[in-house]
């Protein structure tokens, strides 16, 4: 008798987050797409059920001793999940790597390069400096003999060539950058006297009395700084640390105090403050006086002089790492043929390991990135594709891969490569579940599951499931109308001759990263999309150039060194609205972030019951108030420490997640229909429900209406903000900006359609319209064709990525871009 192999993961009774006790079969060995509007339960099904159960069961198969050293998942809220394979998840937002991470280290390409330069290089004799021919002795762990001086030495191993260990530059510690005091920033206004605060660090980083000490040093403190002699200026910037006797008079003029005080010159004041920095806040205070540049010893390569000595084909490791991936592939292919015959098989093995890793990265459109590019400067989409390439390289089988929006940051031209990589995973015998909104990804799925019909409490149901054709025919489907249609325009088009009616924002830049020197002209008071393939320079142009330049001009500070000039008269604010999570812990909720909770606390403190009990507004705070739950301290949950098992996070049994003590349920406020509501009940309502329940509270109503208009009506007031999706976080950050006059503001959104269903994109466009109607200039970095089609003006970067990009290919209306033969974006519009 032959046992029939299971052909599907059977999910029964799933209740994670907003899932409504759903039953669904997910085909095994297929590419499965999960669609649905934001907040409909897609990630709850994919990550909260499939991944959570797949990874938990795999870990449970390990020994107790091993499990104690791993972060473990708790049981998902589901009756049964059958036939689920071991699972791996690629999350929507991989963490930003630290300062020591580069594209080469993240992809492990550096490992192959270091091995190549250790085993196959011409090494330098440490005794006489002569070069020694490549030899198999290095791989065998034997010494090399110098042909010039005859002495023996050992070649560096691969670890000795790593900038994170033995090969690090001693000056910068392997980071490649040095922070130095920028003397020009110490005295920005030389028309002021020292007494008037000309020397900024003495006023912001040091006691004000340093002005008096400078006077005792022989510096005139009552004349404009630009009239000081060269000797006096030298004392201000570089004077010696000597003790001086001063009579300190406090600002209130009471009681002069004699003091002996050591003189700290302006440069040392900054250096001393930098040495004492303990957190980002402290660094921010000092950063304005610092200039960051390449390390003077290693030239930014991160490597020590010894690590830069071995050469392969005439170049060293630093020069190889400076190549783009595309260039490095060509170079690596040619290496084995240049070596002695007996070394070629070993070199070929090392080179093959590099090339097999590189091939996946090229498929995902990352060939434009230099291997030494700092990991922190990679975009979200680039980091996610690096993560995906690492997974595919393993060639494992029988695994469930859950991908959360892998199309983030992916230009339409790169979608085919992404689909190809997912198909390779399926071909290796794996199951791929992909949560995405990109219809070009969804239409490639073998099986499609659509969640909905709406977000939040009204969602959590399977409204369609089957092949793409079957979902298209499903009456209840909300994605069906978008699956095979071209992007449509829903906003009125601004006439060409009216585009710049409200003014210009102009800027000229020098070269930076892959961006060539260029001039850009942006219409004010319009919705402007910055487009282009990955690596074309969009992020560099907008986030690293335009925003810092506008902020510097508004603050009257020096422009970034690569910005030649900027003309943006009347712009006082440049706001980046990104998708990073809001708040660091569960104490931050939608109500507290949107400034609704304080108003609600005051409203409940005015009730007769609160007055009778002696409760003021502060008592209703779930963080510090008298009415917070004493069991969970107002977090709504408690963590149980179970030895040998993972800590179990459970809803607080005392307050049942409301965060409040029992006494809070005795304080009522009358609602619209005469019903009595408590604050815990209100916090458990959605924004839309609370709109009806808070009639009469004008400020609360205004803020709730704003959240509704932002498409966030389904969020509950007590929902922790760190749990919000990227798109939800972005829109919530806008809440405080809506309704204000914005003609002095520029709002920049980095891929605001992340996590948005095509229907949600239409809501987002309405939000942008609201900002533009108030005079704001809205700039979006975007790949989503629906949003690009609806922009007033498009600036298309390219034509390619990396060195093949960095230029403005064309600028104009979406129709102009579509008609531009050189624009890759235009082909898809």
Walk through the language-model features, giving the residues of each.
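Conserved phosphate-binding elements of NTP-dependent enzyme cores
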Residues: 1-829
């Amino acid at each position: 008798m032959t046992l029939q192999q299971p052909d599907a993961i059977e999910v029964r009774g799933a209740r994670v987050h907003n899932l409504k006790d759903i039953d669904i079969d997910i085909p095994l060995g297929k590419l499965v797409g999960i669609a649905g509007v934001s907040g409909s339960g897609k990630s709850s099904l994919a990550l909260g059920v499939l991944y959570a159960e797949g990874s938990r069961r795999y870990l449970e198969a390990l020994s107790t001793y091993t499990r104690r050293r791993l972060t473990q998942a708790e049981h998902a809220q589901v009756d049964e999940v059958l036939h689920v394979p071991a699972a791996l998840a690629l999350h929507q937002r991989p963490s930003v790597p630290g300062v020591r991470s580069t594209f080469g280290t993240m992809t492990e390409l550096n490992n192959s390069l270091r091995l190549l330069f250790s085993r196959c290089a011409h090494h330098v004799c440490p005794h006489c400096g002569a070069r020694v021919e490549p030899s198999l002795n290095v791989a065998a762990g034997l010494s090399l003999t110098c042909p010039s001086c005859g002495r023996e030495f050992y070649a560096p191993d691969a670890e000795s060539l790593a900038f994170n260990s033995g090969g690090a530059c001693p000056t910068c510690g392997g980071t490649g950058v040095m922070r130095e005091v920028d003397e020009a920033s110490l005295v920005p206004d030389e028309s002021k006297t020292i007494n008037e605060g000309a020397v900024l660090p003495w006023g912001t980083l040091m006691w004000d009395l340093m002005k008096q000490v400078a006077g005792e040093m022989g510096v005139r403190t009552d004349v404009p700084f630009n009239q000081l002699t060269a000797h006096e200026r030298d004392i201000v910037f570089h004077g010696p640390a000597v003790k001086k006797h001063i009579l300190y008079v406090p600002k209130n003029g009471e009681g002069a105090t004699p003091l002996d005080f050591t003189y700290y010159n302006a440069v040392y004041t900054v250096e001393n403050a930098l040495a004492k920095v303990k957190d980002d806040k402290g660094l921010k205070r000092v950063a304005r006086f610092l200039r960051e540049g390449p390390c003077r010893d290693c030239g930014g390569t991160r490597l020590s002089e010894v690590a830069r000595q071995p050469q392969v084909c005439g170049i060293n490791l630093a020069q190889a790492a400076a190549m783009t991936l595309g260039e490095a592939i060509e170079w690596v292919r040619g290496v084995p043929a240049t070596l002695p015959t007996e070394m070629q098989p070993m070199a070929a093995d090392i080179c093959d390991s590099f090339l097999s890793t590189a091939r996946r990265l090229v498929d995902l459109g990352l060939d434009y990135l230099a291997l030494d590019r700092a990991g922190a400067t990679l975009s979200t989409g680039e980091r996610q594709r690096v993560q995906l390439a690492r997974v595919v390289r393993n060639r494992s089988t029988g695994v469930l891969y859950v991908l959360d929006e892998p199309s983030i940051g992916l230009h339409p031209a790169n979608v085919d490569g992404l689909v190809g990589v997912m198909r390779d995973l399926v071909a290796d015998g794996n199951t791929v579940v992909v949560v995405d909104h990109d219809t070009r990804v969804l239409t490639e799925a073998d099986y499609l599951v659509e969640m909905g019909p709406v977000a939040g409490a009204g969602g959590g149901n399977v409204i369609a499931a089957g092949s793409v054709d079957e979902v298209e025919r499903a009456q209840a489907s909300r994605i069906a109308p978008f699956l095979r249609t071209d992007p449509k325009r829903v906003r009125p088009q601004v006439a060409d001759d009216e585009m710049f009616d409200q003014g210009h924002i102009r800027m000229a830049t020098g070269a930076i990263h892959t961006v060539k020197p260029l001039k850009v002209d942006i219409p004010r008071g319009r919705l402007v999309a910055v487009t282009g393939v990955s690596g074309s320079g969009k992020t560099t142009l907008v986030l690293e150039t335009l925003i810092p330049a506008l902020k510097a001009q508004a603050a009257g500070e020096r422009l970034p060194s690569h910005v030649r000039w900027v003309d943006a008269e009347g712009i006082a604010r440049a706001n980046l609205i990104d998708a990073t999570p809001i708040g660091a812990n569960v104490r931050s909720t939608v109500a507290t972030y949107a400034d609704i909770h304080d108003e609600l606390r005051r409203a409940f403190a005015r009730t007769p019951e609160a007055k009778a009990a002696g409760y003021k507004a502060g008592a209703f705070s779930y963080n510090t108030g008298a009415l917070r739950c004493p069991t969970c301290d107002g977090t709504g949950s408690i963590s149980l420490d179970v030895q040998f098992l993972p800590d179990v996070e459970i809803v607080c049994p005392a307050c049942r997640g409301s965060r409040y003590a029992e006494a809070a349920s005795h304080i009522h406020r009358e609602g619209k229909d005469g019903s009595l509501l408590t604050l815990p009940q209100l916090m458990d309502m959605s924004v839309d429900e609370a709109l009806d329940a808070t009639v009469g509270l004008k400020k609360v109503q205004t803020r709730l209406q704003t959240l509704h208009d932002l498409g966030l009506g389904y969020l509950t007031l007590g929902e922790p903000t760190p749990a919000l999706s990227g798109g939800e976080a972005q829109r919530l950050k806008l809440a405080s900006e809506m309704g204000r006059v914005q003609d002095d503001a520029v709002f920049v959104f980095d891929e605001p359609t992340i996590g948005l269903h095509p229907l949600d994109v239409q809501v987002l466009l309405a939000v942008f319209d609201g900002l533009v109607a108030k005079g704001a200039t809205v700039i979006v970095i975007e790949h989503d064709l629906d949003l690009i089609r609806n922009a007033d003006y498009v600036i298309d970067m390219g034509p390619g990525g990396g060195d093949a990009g960095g230029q403005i290919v064309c600028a104009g209306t979406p129709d102009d871009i579509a008609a531009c033969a050189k624009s890759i974006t235009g082909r898809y519009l």
